Amino acid sequence: MEYHLRTKLNGNIAMTSCFHENSFLQRDRSLYKFIWVRHGTLDVEVDHVVMHLEKEEMISLTPLHHVQIRGVGGEYLTFLFNSNFYCIYRHDSEVSCNGFLFNGSSRVMRLKLSPSQSARLDSIVDIFRGECGIQDNLQEEMLRIILKRFIITCTRIAREKFDVDPGREN
């Protein structure tokens, strides 16, 4: 699956299951990324450190992270966006581009998803896919809302994993 939207203000949002084959997205150093292994494994190099990700593991990366896919042993999904698409809008601090998932830490946020967490994210991805087929003047805003829902869901999962109280992420 491959979807990419560029807005009039140079905002970008993309979803792909073939990030390792898309040189355009790989070269774009402005993108925030979620990489989610759906089945099998994925070897990813982030800032010269190789990470072996397994089924239902997800990482969130900022534009400052240098990432290369080293080995694909299954199916994965990459959700990407830049600050012109999402971050220029006023968002609550915990779900912003400076929030809990993208707080600039040198450590990569790595999440292991439970079946119920995976199902919640699957439903958001399905909604995103459906919206990709609707070409109208509301699509950009709808995709922004879907992205925010994805980020909020991931933030809740990370809070639970790291036992962080709401509002205490920073």
Predicted regions and their residues:
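Short, Lys/Arg-enriched, Trp-marked, Pro/Gly-tolerant hinge/linker segments that flank
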Residues: 112-115, 132-143, 154-170
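A hydrophobic/aromatic-rich effector-binding and dimerization subdomain
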Residues: 2-10, 70-130, 152-160
